[in-house]
From Swiss-Prot:
Keywords: Cell membrane, Lipoprotein, Membrane, Palmitate, Signal, Sugar transport, Transport. A lipid is attached at residue 23 (S-diacylglycerol cysteine). It is found in: Cell membrane. Gene3D superfamilies: 3.40.50.2300. This is D-threitol-binding protein.
């Protein structure tokens, strides 16, 4: 997703509480109806940047003040950020965690003080969370691996670019990939390693694999689009074209890669929709309103057949999509399908 000046400022921040407030949210001291919600994310990836736009739009429409933090992939930084938000007395906390097995003391502290803490997009290993808004990453991993298996005709050599090791997205997407690989004994994994969701790290990782395996690499399975795009860059710089690549997330550059044929497909995890849904759940919990506390985001497969509509939502008609986001999110919470946005292949709830 496009990274503007604000996004770069967020990504570079390592201090606690960046204090970015949603436009129009208002001053909580002047308006007692304002809900103050703290947010800490693992990093400002393309996916999270798109998600921030969605959360800001939902916050503006619902009188929510957002206090944004980026942990820059550091567990201790994220723990300090959550501690700070608890001390500030926010009404709810949203966490996109660096690691699944982190933040146990902070989760317990938030619960003890009556502050709903909701992991969104990446899970926390805790029974004390107030809600849980997660994608089905196992299904997404299986979906992308099945795309690759179909393209390879059930045999060939692949490399796998993983997310940060130990993060729930990496663990579950790996599980889904392995489930499909078990059905195809003639597909061999030459190498797999993390590139931490980052495009630049994937470029370097892929160049090393190209040096080591050369033409043996028949396909690249990337656990997100950014890493797939890094692999694509490395392949092109090495003079290799036509190597099938599949990703997950459906960020702008990933969707364009599907349209151009550089990717065989992706799975749309529209951060704008998913993180806004997480905010809606946290907001209702903070207000004591009824809500499904554990909705699941099911990613639709994106191929050349339906990529144009996804591009409209993520890129070319984005403002129109953002303008209708609150209505979409609220309707999706009622139907239970928080991923629905009218992509061809999605079933109307």
């Amino acid at each position: 997703m496009r990274l503007g000046t604000t996004a770069f400022a967020i990504a570079s921040a390592t201090a606690l509480g960046l204090g970015l407030t949603a436009c129009g949210a208002g001053d909580p001291a002047a308006n007692s109806d304002t809900t103050r919600i703290g947010v800490t994310v693992y990093d400002m990836s393309s996916f999270i940047t798109a998600g921030k736009e969605g959360m800001d739009a939902y916050a503006k429409d619902n009188n929510i003040e957002l206090i944004w933090n980026s942990a820059n992939l550091d567990v201790s930084t994220q723990a300090s950020q959550v501690d700070s938000m608890i001390n500030q007395g926010v009404d709810a906390i949203i966490v996109v965690p660096v690691q699944a097995d982190s933040l146990a003391p902070q989760v317990a502290s938030a619960k003890a003080k009556g502050i709903p803490l909701v992991p969104v997009n990446a899970a926390l290993d805790s029974k004390d969370i107030a809600g849980n808004v997660q994608p089905d990453d196992v299904a997404a991993g299986a979906q992308e691996m099945q795309m690759m298996a179909d393209r390879l005709g059930g045999k060939g050599n692949i490399v796998i670019l993983q997310g940060p090791l130990g993060q729930s997205g990496e663990l579950d997407r790996s599980k889904g990939i392995e489930q499909v690989l078990a059905k195809y004994p003639d597909i061999k994994v030459l190498a797999k390693d993390t590139a931490n969701w980052k495009r630049d790290e994937a470029v370097n990782k892929m160049k090393n694999w190209i040096s080591g395996f050369g033409p043996q690499i028949d396909g690249v399975v990337a656990q997100n689009d950014d890493m797939g795009l890094g692999a694509l860059q490395a392949l092109k710089e090495s003079g290799r074209t036509g190597v099938p690549i599949v990703g997950i997330d459906g960020i702008e550059d990933g969707l364009n890669a599907v349209k151009s044929g550089d990717f065989i497909g992706t799975s749309l995890q529209n951060g704008t929709v998913e993180l806004a849904a997480g905010l809606a759940v946290a907001n209702r919990l903070a207000k004591g309103e009824p809500v499904n506390k554990e909705p699941v985001y099911i990613m639709p497969a994106i191929t050349k057949d339906n990529v144009d509509v996804a591009i409209e939502h993520v890129v070319t008609e984005r403002q129109q999509f953002l303008d209708g986001l609150t209505e979409l999110i609220n309707k999706n919470l009622e139907t239970g399908d928080i991923a629905y946005e009218g992509i061809p292949g999605q079933k109307q709830p």
